[in-house]
């Protein structure tokens, strides 16, 4: 029996984001800049991470509260050993209709088949440039874009449904929009361009670095004939368009210029086992890991999750101004703990 619960703003709970690790093999400036996350950076020890059994238990309880979709994030989730074991466990939960994973793609050839065999069917690959030199400068690990493109080709060849996510920063990679759109249009792969967000504390964000949806659309319409597409479901974060000549869709995610707080249905669990109701959360999250390890029953866990959702009133992107951004500096949870 699924309970229907809503938060203070009337938003139901439909999605669960599970961060399985705080580690990543890239050092992108907007997420894990190398100056902060150097070779001597201390990541979470294994006992500080939720176990797969704990994650599956959490997901099962959330499914009883209305969660239908789960997304596995990180850090880089493919760095978590035996991730296919978690995928298999999540696939056995009644009520979960969709399991996705967000990855930088570097380890897809190594782990893609085992994840597919465990039941994973859908992945989002983060790729912020198609130019090799530029992409190397973005990831700060000397990884070429062509390497990731080969991993994407492999993923599609084994049956994974791939979408590509691109975070656009003004003056950094906004010149990649057209060539990337052209490349993935020909590949019949959906690409989504994301406005640069002020997630975490270390990415040097300010409004001047944002390329808005309208600015992107103006650029795109100078090169392609497109039509808008109606939203597929409540809470869809991207504004979708379709190429007139071959029908391939692409999306623009307006995380800054046109917020979607009013339809946000996502609960988030960080890699250290804490609940957050918002990607931009500033207060320390509720420690689900400690709560579970104290010996609570599933019913007690459900009541706690209900209470956390019912007091949720987060709407940071609705309220974002230069002042709120300044006030929240050094207070937000970093992206490698909570995922995207």
UniProtKB/Swiss-Prot annotation:
Binding site for S-adenosyl-L-methionine: 30, 75, 126, 197
Signal sequence, renumbered to the chain: none
Alphabetical GO biological process terms: Mo-molybdopterin cofactor biosynthetic process
Record carries keyword NADP: no
Cofactor: [4Fe-4S] cluster
CDD domains to which the protein is assigned, alphabetical: Radical_SAM (cd01335), Twitch_MoaA (cd21117)
Class in the EC hierarchy, top level: lyase
EC numbers, comma separated: 4.1.99.22
Spans traversing the lipid bilayer: none
Binding site for GTP: 17, 71, 102, 163, 266-268
Catalysed reactions, as listed in the record: GTP + AH2 + S-adenosyl-L-methionine = (8S)-3',8-cyclo-7,8-dihydroguanosine 5'-triphosphate + 5'-deoxyadenosine + L-methionine + A + H(+)
Pathway involvement of the protein, from the record: Cofactor biosynthesis; molybdopterin biosynthesis
Residues in Radical SAM core domain copies: 8-227
Superkingdom assignment: Bacteria
Task performed by this protein: Catalyzes the cyclization of GTP to (8S)-3',8-cyclo-7,8-dihydroguanosine 5'-triphosphate.
Entries under HAMAP family matching the protein: MoaA_B
Protein's name according to its UniProt entry: GTP 3',8-cyclase
Organism: Staphylococcus aureus (strain Mu3 / ATCC 700698)
Gene: moaA
